[in-house]
Amino acid sequence: ILGPDGARMSKSRGNVISPDPYVEKYGSDVLRLYLLFGFSYREGGPWDDNGIKAITKFYDRVERLSQKVISLHANKNDKIDAAEKDLLYTRNYTVRCMTRDIEDFSFNTATARLMEYLNALNKYDTADGEKNIKLFKECFSDFILLLAPFAPHFSEEIWEQLGNKKSVFLSSYPE
């Protein structure tokens, strides 16, 4: 990671960024997500405070959706129509691509896929018509399982709020 000026971080240049104030202000999970999303594992890049603010917005969107999902109660609607098929397609595509991205150390791409999956979950949530709540909760749970390696504390907290008894890290990776 380069300094904000684009030069290699160095005490002598005075462009070293300490993570401590960022952890204090945003939390370790937001900082971790920023580092994974903002920089290619192989290439790096310059530090940018706007990037961490963007990750904070993503984090907030996950939090808002999690509160909605937690408050939902199962319904008898178990239909799989076009909206459900779209959501399942996005879920399966995300799992497949993220698995490959993680194996290739393309963490920035894997994180971008999480953002796309969150967009699909929000789209399903705000669409007109009756929802398949069971499917929606399952897809959101899979999202949390995928998020867990990138934001472990946040994911564990949501996982427990979803009513799961064992740790998110003792749960099976989505297939």
Label the model's feature ranges.
Residues 12-20:
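C-terminal, charged and often intrinsically disordered regions of DNA end-processing helicases
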Residues 2-3:
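Primarily short, surface-exposed interaction patches in extracytoplasmic proteins
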Residues 21-175:
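Helix-rich, typically C-terminal accessory recognition domains appended to large enzymatic cores
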